[in-house]
Amino acid sequence: MKKAGFLFLAAMAIIVVSLNAKDPNVLRKIVFEKCLPNYEKNQNPSPCIEVKPDAGYVVLKDINGPLQYLLMPTTHISGIENPLLLDPSTPNFFYLSWQARDFMSKKYGKPIPDYAISLTINSKKGRSQNHFHIHISCISLDVRKQLDNNLKNINSRWSPLSGGLNGHKYLARRVTESELAQKSPFVMLAKEVPNAHKRMGDYGLAVVQQSDNSFVLLATQFNPLTLNRASAEEIQDHECAILR
């Protein structure tokens, strides 16, 4: 039994080491050492699928999931905690990500309905990469149903989402597409949720369209006591069961 226990602990140690050994700067290297140089030299965005230096972003096909894409800045922004995201001159990355959703349909071979799409960014402690990236991917069926059921309960003020999502507490706020286009969700979170501006890195944030064509912003806060790493990506299903 002692030997078995030792082997188990050894195996766990190997797993932990392997996870920690993953390079947290892979995305940054792809953007600054591959996509941007290749575009500047050859007008070829590869390995990204789109490079927009003037608009300040690139789009990359993620290796996880058949339809998941990442939108990333062409400046050095580590994540949601970066003060640049609250600067009015910074691109509205969430709205740019929404406009980039068409890459999913092109990859899929036919139009993907907007209700099936979600945008997310993870908290500082809930992410694996240290270059800002918004996940453009399918929403999970369970989350889609829960948001549909809460449609009438979500208003223009941040308020707790009834029942939470995936066992974690979330705040929800309704916005119109015009509001989403004009004002960054990062700014809305920082200015409207008490004390959020002091600890933006603790939050995961998501954007989903509702059946009435409004959008819902979803924010979850890091809480080790409830095992919530504030990985808003948890609302997504990168295998896209919602399309089957």
UniProtKB/Swiss-Prot annotation:
Pfam families: CDH (PF02611)
Main location class: membrane
Gene Ontology molecular functions: CDP-diacylglycerol diphosphatase activity
Gene3D superfamilies: HIT family - CDH-like
Biological-process GO terms, alphabetical: CDP-diacylglycerol catabolic process; phospholipid biosynthetic process
EC number(s) reported in the record: 3.6.1.26
Intracellular or extracellular location(s): Cell inner membrane
Domain of life: Bacteria
UniProt keyword annotations, A-Z: Cell inner membrane, Cell membrane, Hydrolase, Lipid biosynthesis, Lipid metabolism, Membrane, Phospholipid biosynthesis, Phospholipid metabolism, Transmembrane, Transmembrane helix
Pathway: Phospholipid metabolism; CDP-diacylglycerol degradation; phosphatidate from CDP-diacylglycerol: step 1/1
SUPFAM superfamilies the UniProt entry points to: HIT-like
Transmembrane segments: 7-23
Reactions this protein catalyses: a CDP-1,2-diacyl-sn-glycerol + H2O = a 1,2-diacyl-sn-glycero-3-phosphate + CMP + 2 H(+)
Topology in membrane: Single-pass membrane protein
GO cellular component, one term: plasma membrane
InterPro entries noted in UniProt: CDP-diacylglyc_Pase (IPR003763), CDP-diacylglyc_Pase_proteobac (IPR015993), HIT-like_sf (IPR036265)
Annotated family: Belongs to the Cdh family.
Name recorded for this polypeptide: CDP-diacylglycerol pyrophosphatase
UniProt source species: Helicobacter pylori (strain J99 / ATCC 700824)
Gene encoding the protein: cdh
